[in-house]
Regions:
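Core structural elements
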Residues: 199-209
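Globular "head" domains of long coiled-coil molecular machines
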Residues: 1-197, 201
Length: 209
């Protein structure tokens, strides 16, 4: 499927085709990271259409329905979180919350006075979630070039700046997200291993007959 380069060419802005990058090596993890577009409900004249809305939503749902998928539901902290469709879809497709990790971005853009509500959400005081929330600070391209500076910027916001410094270190920053993901991946492997190993045993038995 072709993608639009000009507003007037009438081609779709999004495609169901997948650009795949594979990294092989003895020290590489055996996993797939799938970056999908964000779900949206409103068209942009000359840029997106109703068919784009449907295509993106179907694409996202297709991956979320896979019981082996870990869902990272990313939501900006400076919007009405309760109205974000991705959160509701995650509840529907993963009602136990065992494979959904919710991530809040852009905490530095939250209106003054609204931080307490975000903190209560992350701390689980508003609703109970199995895996909860992690808050991360978005970094500029220049900041990403030096990871030590990136960590310092996060620590400056979450470790020293009220009211964000009320958050537990388990609930903010890239390191907390990395730790949560590692634990989630390990739990996912343990949960799915019986269903993966059973077919392997059957194939092995058949080949020996």
């Amino acid at each position: 499927m072709g993608l639009s380069k000009e507003v007037e060419d009438n081609l779709p802005t999004f495609s169901s085709d997948v650009l795949r990058l594979e990294i092989h090596g003895p020290d590489e993890n055996h996993l797939s990271v799938i970056d999908v577009p964000g779900i949206f409900k409103t068209t942009t004249p000359g840029l997106t259409s109703k068919s784009d809305i449907t295509l993106v939503r179907d694409m996202v749902l297709n991956y979320m329905r896979n019981p082996r998928s870990i869902i990272l539901a990313v939501v900006p902290a400076n919007v009405d979180i309760a109205t974000q469709e991705i959160i509701e879809l995650a509840r529907e497709l993963d009602p136990d919350g065992m494979r959904t990790l919710r991530i809040l971005t852009k905490p530095d853009l939250v209106d003054k006075g609204a931080e307490d509500k975000i903190i209560e959400l992350v701390e689980g005081k508003q609703e109970s979630q199995e895996l909860g929330w992690v808050v991360v600070k978005n970094l500029g391209q220049k900041d990403l070039q030096d990871l030590s500076i990136s960590r310092d910027l996060e620590e400056d916001l979450f470790g020293h700046s009220p009211p964000w410094n009320r958050l537990s270190s388990d609930n903010y920053g890239i390191e907390a997200l990395r730790t949560r993901l590692q634990a989630l991946l390990a739990a996912n492997v343990r949960r799915e291993f019986p269903s993966v190993s059973a077919p392997s045993s059957i194939c092995s038995t058949k080949s020996n007959l």
